[in-house]
Amino acid sequence: MDHFKQLEVWFVIGSQHLYGPETLRQVKENAEKVVTGLNQQANLPVKLVLKPLVKTPDEILALCRDANYQDNCIGLLTWLHTFSPAKMWIGGLSILSKPLLQFHTQFNAEVPWDTMDMDFMNLNQTAHGGREFGFIGARMRQAHQVVVGHWQDKNAHARIGKWMRVAAAIQESKQLKVARFGDNMREVAVTEGDKVGAQIQFGYSVSAWGLGDLTAVVDAVSKGDINALVDEYEASYQLTDAVKLNGANRQNLLDAAQIELGMKRFLEQGGYHAFTTDFENLYGLKQLPGLAVQRLMQQGYGFGGEGDWKTAALLRIMKVMASGLSGGTSFMEDYTYNFQNGNDLVVGSHMLEVCPTIAKEQKPILDAQYLGIGGKADPARLIFSTPAGPSLNASVIDMGDRFRMLVNLVDTIEQPHPLPKLPVARAIWKAQPSLDVAAEAWILAGGAHHTVFSQALDLEHMRLYAEMQNIELLVIDNETRLHEFKDALRWNEVYYKLCSR
């Protein structure tokens, strides 16, 4: 998935006519060098495009209006090279609907002690020009991010890159369509929620489809297409004897391929990039979609089990955010615990639907085995473990008056023992700061049993996302202390009731 190829971030320099044409010429020349240098050397995921210098309120308003209407523009990066009186920005910022990053930098890294004169001081005023811009952002309660550092500094590059990834994810969220095949698992609470409220908050829409609509597309898949996809399976995975040619469950594999092709065509035809299924709504399907869901997630689709549309949307959004990074991102569920003094572990999995982007094995096992849930034929699935490394679990829940995101940092470990009788993909981790604290905090905060598990993204990505979406964020990591966490829950309740808008 390369979601960033056609996207742009507009690099905007603010100044004013006060300084005269020569100073403005130098500002433009320096800006061109900075943008060229960042595009060539900073390893940014999205291309920077230098826009004409803005010097008046009308120019700023026109630029912000253009940014709103350009689909490939995902945000503005501003640099106050000189002093740009911030009242000029009120009109533009009032209508800006794209993410905004203020890059508090300057062209020169060091002060030229021997040669610095007032001309130099006039030209290089970021130190106070940036503060003026920051004031109007704060005064307008304008949600924006700030990166401070020289434009050739690698730490600044990394932070800008993360902001770009999240800005691209925000753009995806605004246009995302989620398809629900069937309904939510009956009597489950956390997978419910306000879909209208979610569309207002995040931008994505959620549409329900009956199983008959899906099965009509599945049934229309040709045998030739099924056989071609099975050939791909045989080249990509280790097939068990049961699903090899003439194996006892070979037909189950063919049925799984048909479901995958039908689901993908349905999603493509409707412009959907995330979807849900429910084992209680399988009318017309021969098996619970397992392999199909795994492979569609690998191709970038978001997914949520049991009708969990919030997790499906979050998975798609995080996959866009993580595009091109090492490590995978998957639908996940805390399934069972290993309570052992000094070695408390969580086994994460699901009935079938874990994304192969987090697989340790180059060729996962492909099998079809019994699954009592759903009451259908033995479903095909990929079986694998997950490599060790820093990871996170994220969940978005509907609190009635707001959306809350929880993030728990975890340390994934190599599978400590064989699991010869467990026919599903899995990840095994140590929760931060400990299993008892992490689980208690998660439960107190109402975190869902479904999560998005990622070894590609880190906490800063998720903080930025929560800030840009203006939603509550609760973090559980090695710094978490339960009494402080409980205090934060109480304070947040008051804050969001007083400050909701």
Swiss-Prot record:
Cofactor binding note: Binds 1 Mn(2+) ion per subunit.
Molecular function in Gene Ontology: L-arabinose isomerase activity; manganese ion binding
InterPro entries, A to Z: Ara_Isoase_C, AraA_central, AraA_N, AraA_N_sf, Fuc/Ara_isomerase_C, Fucose_isomerase_N/cen_sf, Lara_isomerase
Listed transmembrane segments: none
Pathway noted in the entry: Carbohydrate degradation; L-arabinose degradation via L-ribulose; D-xylulose 5-phosphate from L-arabinose (bacterial route): step 1/3
Reactions the enzyme catalyzes: beta-L-arabinopyranose = L-ribulose
Pfam families: AraA_central, AraA_N, Arabinose_Iso_C
Domain of life: Bacteria
Binding site for Mn(2+): 306, 333, 350, 450
Entry cofactors: Mn(2+)
Gene Ontology terms: biological process: L-arabinose catabolic process to xylulose 5-phosphate
GO cellular component labels: cytosol
Uppermost EC category: isomerase
Family membership noted in the UniProt record: Belongs to the arabinose isomerase family.
Function: Catalyzes the conversion of L-arabinose to L-ribulose.
Subunit (UniProt): Homohexamer.
Protein name per UniProt: L-arabinose isomerase
Natural source organism: Pectobacterium carotovorum subsp. carotovorum (strain PC1)
